[in-house]
Amino acid sequence: MNIGVLNSGGDCPGLNAVIEGVVGAASRRGWNVVGFYDGFEGLLSEEGDDRFEWLTPAGCRGLRAKGGTILGTVNKGNFAIKVGVGQKGEIEPAVLEKTKATVKRLGLDALIVVGGDGSQSTALLLAEIGLPVVGVPKTIDNDLGATDVTFGFNSAVAIVSESLDRLETTANAHQRMICLLYTSDAAD
């Protein structure tokens, strides 16, 4: 069996851990895993312009301890759809056809999509054209309706809390100081 994995949307802690876990579990079952670079955009690979890599347990060992994602991630491009609750986005038919061609060329039996609300909406559209898809919810915003908490959120909260604690110590050491901590704007 051949399965694909991609990260889509914004970066968050835990993406590499998912990749390592997928590759390890697949390997124990005798399956092959292809990782797509730059989210869904990697699905638009053409012969000679491969935007993917066949992943091995040896090549992924230790990833869970590293931030970011070895595959890269994109929240714009050919697959970017913004939808509200209960609304459905669309992807250009030519993009879907190129996606089907890549899936067929690689002999993929399924695709694992690690992403937030927009990414999971795109995954649904791919499932509707016949590609078996497994969605792994992730978001630092914790705004996915079907989950209580997603990975990425707890890590983001912990890092912001620790940063605030450190800033408080610095601010208390000086009589006239204003400290600002900038974080992601979930509205973007």
What are these language model-derived features?
Residues M1-S8, V18-G107, V114, G118:
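A cross-family phosphate/adenosyl-ligand binding-site feature
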Residues G10-P13, E90, D117, T147-S155:
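Alpha-helix capping and helix-loop boundary segments enriched in small/acidic/polar residues
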Residues Y37, A127-T150, V157-I159:
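Short, acidic/small-residue loops that bind anionic groups at enzyme active sites
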Residues V95-L96, S155-T170:
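Active-site glycine-rich loop that binds ribose-phosphate moieties when present
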Residues A110-G118, A127, T169:
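Glycine-rich, mobile lid/loop segments that gate access to catalytic sites or pores
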Residues R176-I178:
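Long, structured protein-protein interaction/assembly regions in large complexes
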Residues Y182-D188:
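Conserved small/polar residues in nucleotide/adenosyl-binding loops
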